[in-house]
Amino acid sequence: MVKIMAPITPTTSPQVKGLLSRFLTAPDRHPKLRYVYDISLIAISILCIVSIILWTQGSGLALFAIAPALAIGALGVTLLVSDLAESPKSKEVADTVAAVSLPFILTGTAAGLMFSAIAVGGGAVILANPLFLMGSMTLGFALMSLHKVTYQYLSNRSQWQKQNKIKQIESAAWENKLPKESKESSLQTSVRYSSLARKDKTRRNKPGMPNKGSQVPASIANTERSLRSEEVLHSQSLLRQKELFPNTSNIKKELPNTKSILHTPLNRRSPSGSDSDDVYYTPRAGLSSAETSALGDISGISSSSTSSKTSTPKAKRRVVRSSRSERNARHHRNKEDHRQNQEESSDDEDSSPLPSPRRKKYRSRPK
């Protein structure tokens, strides 16, 4: 069983409504009251410090209560700076005021503590007075704040001003250049597209330029037509052979000897000295017309009448090319056979015994 969970309703925390909560949340409801609260904290801390010094007259353990008063004053200063730093201009003003006034405030408090210690009692007792010790510590903090806060802020402020000037110049230049660049880019794109469109139009208008999409189907159709025409021619040649020679077994037996009948090389050399390896003749005088036609059909050469009836001009060219390639292949084979025969005959002549020199002399004598 699937358990259906009920939707969980968010629980709201109970709002505390009281005088203290309203007093603390007043700056959130009224932003201008923030400055009043910050200044009041600073004033309270100053009043506490002055009242402690006057009440103790520079002696006693009550002087250590100045430390929380100083902390409250520092908190008021930081809150005032953060409230003033809402806009960039107010932030710059608040940062400069805090950086410059902090060392002076610390030196003033240190001087007040030291003078109060001196007023209570002089001599070596001053070094044991807690007011004097606290004054010396605050003086050290003032020097540290002068180096770490004021000097660094002033040095960084010059860099920030330079960076802001550079950014303003870049933004102004970019805003001025934006319309020009947009116009130039639009012109360039329009020119490019217009040139491409013109090229496409010229290509389409040309009669001899086929489209790229129609090239592949045309080539496929041509190859299919050529294959069909070759199949038709081959079947017709076989039918014609059967009509002319019903006894095809005798023809098949005589086929191996057709090489020697068709192409017989001339072993004798011409008197001019040129090699006769490339000279061949086809003695068909002893063959009948039926045999020659059969041999022509076997070699792949079809008659013009049958090809003209059943084949297209492209198929005719295809058949003529195939017959030429077959002739070239046979010619090459006959050349190789003739060379092998010559090599065998030369080997036989080398292996035969040489005639005696007497017989040679006898033969060379004139009768």
Curated annotation (Swiss-Prot):
One of its GO terms (cellular component) is plasma membrane. Residues 323-342 have a biased composition (Basic and acidic residues). Belongs to the chlamydial CPn_0443/CT_005/TC_0273 family. Keywords: Cell membrane, Membrane, Transmembrane, Transmembrane helix. The chain crosses the membrane at residues 35-55, 61-81, 92-112, 113-133. Residues 177-220, 249-283, 296-367 are annotated as: Disordered. InterPro entries: DUF5423. The keyword rRNA processing does not apply. It is found in: Cell membrane. Residues 302-312 have a biased composition (Low complexity). It comes from Chlamydia muridarum (strain MoPn / Nigg). Residues 257-274 have a biased composition (Polar residues). Residues 357-367 have a biased composition (Basic residues). It is a multi-pass membrane protein. This is Uncharacterized protein TC_0273.
